[in-house]
Amino acid sequence: PDQRDSVRALELAQFMIQRRDELDWHELDTVAAALAANGDFARATQFQTLALEKMAADEDLSKDRRAAARKRMSARLGKYRNDRDYVLDYRAIDEMRAGRL
């Protein structure tokens, strides 16, 4: 929580929110996190669900990368459904690079 400014994140995300149909799945995932960080879990759930749908249809994503992304994004969706926001554990970046997440 000390590493982020959720109000500013939501301000910046407004442009993206207005263009939700034009966004790709990573952008939708980011908007969902900004919404959740500001307590708007219902809309965070909507954006994360749309992100998962678009990610599943991404033909440029390999099967392995799709499975890993689905796992991470579904976990975030579960948090939003339980009124919890998502904070990246920066140690997870090394795990993702190593293919363990």
What are the roles of these predicted feature ranges?
Residues 36, 50-51:
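A short alpha/beta connector and helix-capping loop motif
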Residues 30, 34-37, 73-76:
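"A position-specific structural signal for the A-helix of alpha-solenoid helical repeats
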Residues 3-7, 15, 21, 25, ...:
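Terminal, low-structured helical/coil segments at or just beyond the last alpha-helical repeat
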Residues 4, 39-40:
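Short helix-adjacent coil turns
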